[in-house]
Structures are given as structure tokens and as C-alpha cells.
Amino acid sequence: MTVLKMTDLDLQGKRVLIREDLNVPVKDGVVTSDARILAALPTIKLALEKGAAVMVCSHLGRPTEGEFSAENSLKPVADYLSKALGRDVALVADYLDGIEVKAGDLVLFENVRFNKGEKKNADELAQKYAALCDVFVMDAFGTAHRAEGSTHGVAKFAKVAAAGPLLAAELDALGKALKAPAKPMAAIVAGSKVSTKLDVLNSLSSVCDQLIVGGGIANTFLAAAGHPVGKSLYEPDLVETAKAIAAKVSVPLPVDVVVAKEFAESAEATVKAIADVAADDMILDIGPQTAANFAELLKSSKTILWNGPVGVFEFDQFGNGTKVLAKAIADSAAFSIAGGGDTLAAIDKYGVSAEISYISTGGGAFLEFVEGKVLPAVAILEERAKA
């Protein structure tokens, strides 16, 4: 994957527009989770150190395009950046017709989705973005799967279009895990439905040696193998699909599970052998023996890709399976990459972030890359690098 990298460019005195993913949760005007801002800070600092005039843009939430909405304003992000960097970071609302930014200055543009044509990737808007800068830097992996004005269009028209350090690191890590993984490779794919992760399962079945499934996905595989799943969430119409995937790659199945009679925080958890699951049982986690078996598989792996908790870990009594696997990944010498919203929440809960080789910041983009799809914002950077 050949793209120009911001780290290789001379930015002294250049006007640099950086597209970051600063789409963070905000409550009462205050940022409540700063992970994405923290991930973007090194890129912003590096551009400033290189002597650039720095303009940062992002979206936040889903406002009606072309209309200002206070709840989707990036003001809380500007306030956060001002504190984090110890300098005033101005939030600029009117910038499309040009803005004066000096070398060493930093401004944050207001939500790009307030601009008409952003989501449709309108050339007219993209050309206005491009006219603002000498160098456009795409650093928002989380939005790389969307062809929008500030992620794709601007890269077509900017004098120079490059990948930022965060995006470059993400692409390198994903390439390492998927293009030529050290073997044996294990993948953990969990979630409520096979249908939503079918392309991921199919794609991984051709590169990994062990495909560990969890959640509702595992229930469909259990049913495909003829095991009882009680009243658990599963997809009867995808049983044949599960059989076809299991014929291509080793899919180790649970030997024991944690069940309950209801889906609730107060539900009583009972460990049962898989054959003993009753008609009114709901499977909400893998059992301790299964967790130990899966941990053993992870121990002998050289590459691990993790997407999704294997149980309802938000309720502690159904979190042991995810906790054991999280610790096994942390203790493993394998190159490990994790991604997807719930996965990140599990990593936080069990305190293993420092031990995972790479944590992906992109939810949808992470999955689309794993599926083998082309990410438009990356494809345009590759095109520009060739030219």
C-alpha cells in the first residue's frame, strides 16, 4: 500500500489541513470520552513542530447537512484541545472562502457536516477545502470507508495529499495482520448476528487457522453442529452458511456455556455443559472450560485479530469468558490487533490496552478493511501517490 506520508514531508511554512476523527461523545458541552482526541494529538503536535500553519477538521454526530446545530458543534473539542495543548485553539465557523493562518498557528474548523455537499462528496465543496491548504493530511481511519468531501473529495483536488501518522499506523497494523500474518493465526469474531459479520467471517476463514466465534454468532454455529441453544439469540436461516464456513476453517465450539432464564443485569448465571442447555435457557457467555480451551489456542498463536466480546460482559456474571480471553491475548507473544466499539469497551474494562499490539480506532472502517473492501479515502491517497 503506497501512500505519501505526512512524516516524510517538509511542512515548514505550509498550510496543512488535517482531517481527524474527533467524533467524540459530548454531554452538557463537555467531552465524555477523549480516546479519539488523544489518538489525534501526536499528529497535530508533529505538524506544529514541523512549522506548519495547522487547520484541523472533523465531523461530530449526524446533524442535518448544511445547518448549524449547537449539539453537534465542535466547541467542546476546541475547549479540550486548548487545555491539552496549553494554547488557545480557535473554533472557526466561516472558513470555506479562505482563512488567514500563520505558521505555528492552530485552528479547528467547525463540524464539516454543517457544509452542504459534505456527505455527497460534492466537487464544489471539495475544491473549496483543497484551496485552503498546500497539503491535505487524511488521518481519520474511522471515516476512511466513507467517500465524503473532507475524507475523499479534498484529496482529489489538494496540491499534495498524504496519510497522517495515525492512519499510516492503522494501515500498517492491519496489513501485518491480514496480508501476510505470522502463523498460526487466530481470529475472535463475536457479535449478535452472523448476517452482519458474514463478510468478515468469510474473509478471515481464508487467512486464519482458528476462527473463534462468540455471542449470537456462536449460537448459530452451535445450532449448525446440532447442539441445543434454548431460547438464545441465533439465526436459523444461516445455519447452512455456518456449516459452510466451518468446513473451510477450524471453528472451535464451546463445550460449556453460562446461561440465564432472562437477559438482565440481575439474572442468575448458571454454568452448563453444552448438551444440558434447556429450552428456556439463554446462552450469555462461554463457560470456564471453554474459556480455558480458547486461551490455550491463543497462547500458541503468532497473530491474533479480536473483534467483539464473547459474552454479555457489561453484566459481570457473564463477563468471565471475555475477561479470560482478554488476559490471554495480553499475555500472548503474538502480534495482536483489536477493533470494534464493544471490543474497545472490553479492553478498557479489563485493563489490557497496554499489552495489545494495536488497537484500531475505526469501527466500520476496521470491519470493511477486514472484509477486504477498498476504503475510498485510502484508495484516493494511493492514486495521488502514483501520480
UniProtKB/Swiss-Prot annotation:
Matching Pfam families, A to Z? PGK
Name any GO cellular component annotation: cytosol
What this protein catalyses is: (2R)-3-phosphoglycerate + ATP = (2R)-3-phospho-glyceroyl phosphate + ADP
Residue sites binding substrate per the record:
21-23, 36, 59-62, 113, 146
Q: What pathway does the annotation place this protein in?
A: Carbohydrate degradation; glycolysis; pyruvate from D-glyceraldehyde 3-phosphate: step 2/5
Enzyme Commission (EC) number: 2.7.2.3
**Subcellular location, in the record's words?**
Cytoplasm
Judged by the first EC level, this protein's enzyme class is transferase
SUPFAM superfamilies the record matches:
Phosphoglycerate kinase
| Recorded GO MF terms | ADP binding; ATP binding; phosphoglycerate kinase activity
- Alphabetical keyword list: ATP-binding, Cytoplasm, Glycolysis, Kinase, Nucleotide-binding, Transferase
Give the residues the record marks as binding ATP.
197, 314, 340-343
Source organism, top-level taxon: Bacteria
The family classification in the record reads: Belongs to the phosphoglycerate kinase family.
Q: Which HAMAP family match?
A: Phosphoglyc_kinase
Subunit note: Monomer.
* Name of the protein this chain belongs to: Phosphoglycerate kinase
